[in-house]
């Protein structure tokens, strides 16, 4: 399966809305984040058991964001 098939909301986000960041840095405690030109939209937990779990959490969060913000 493709990344777009596994994480359709992440794919839509990076195609149409903004970008994601994965990993730790000096500015955030979260492992995965979604951002747009206005800044941080969502940030996940500080740790996930797997990268798959982090991407699933991100995809679910973006699905909720699309529903709330764009009425999808």
Predicted regions and their residues:
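Short N-terminal "domain-start" leader segments
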Residues: 1-29
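Mixed-charge, Lys/Arg-enriched low-complexity segments
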Residues: 1-2, 36-72
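Short, intrinsically disordered low-complexity segments
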Residues: 11-14, 32, 46, 70
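Short aromatic-glycine-(Arg/Gly/Cys) micro-motifs in beta-strand/loop hairpins
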Residues: 18-43, 61
């Amino acid at each position: 399966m493709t990344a777009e098939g596994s994480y359709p909301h992440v794919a839509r986000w990076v195609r149409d809305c903004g970008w994601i960041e994965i990993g730790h840095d000096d500015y955030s405690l979260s492992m995965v984040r979604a951002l747009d030109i206005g800044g941080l939209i969502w940030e996940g937990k500080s740790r996930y058991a797997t990268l798959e779990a982090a991407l699933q959490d991100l995809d679910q969060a973006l699905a909720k964001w699309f529903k709330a913000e764009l009425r999808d």
